[in-house]
C-alpha cells in the first residue's frame, strides 16, 4: 500500500526486490500473438493490469498499463526517471541524486490510476468493434468496470475460470490465454 511504502520504505524495497523484480522473464505466446495482431493492424491497443512490461518486450507499441510498470521508476521529489537496473543494483532505499526517494511507477493500494491512461482505455474500448478480454477474472475494479463502455458488435472472453461477463459475451473460451492466442495463425492475416 501507499501507506506501507511511505512508513516502511526499506522493508517495501526488500519485498519489491525479492518478489516483483523478475529477471529473465520472457513474453509468452499470448504477448507475441497480440504484438503480431497490432503489427498487422488488427489490434488498436493492449490494455493491461500487468506491471511486467512483457507486452512491450513482445513488440506491442500501444500498451496502456493501468497499474504502471516495474520497469519505470521516478524520484518523488524532482521526477527524474530511473530504470529497473538502478533499483535492483541500489542498496536499501533507492535515492535520486537530488536526495529524493525513488518510487516504482506502479499503482499501490490507496493510489489512484492515472487519469490519462483511464481516459485512453475507455476511448479504445468504447470505439472497438470487437473486444477481447483475456487472462483476467474481471474482479479488480475499476478496470473490471471498463467493459461497460464497450458498445461494439462482438465480445470475446478468454479465461480459464468463469467471469461475471461470460453471460454477455458472444464467445467464451475457457482455456489459458497463452494457449488460445498462441494457436492463432497471426502471420496469415491480411489487410
Describe each PLM feature range.
Residues 1-189:
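Conserved catalytic core of sirtuin-type NAD+-dependent deacylases
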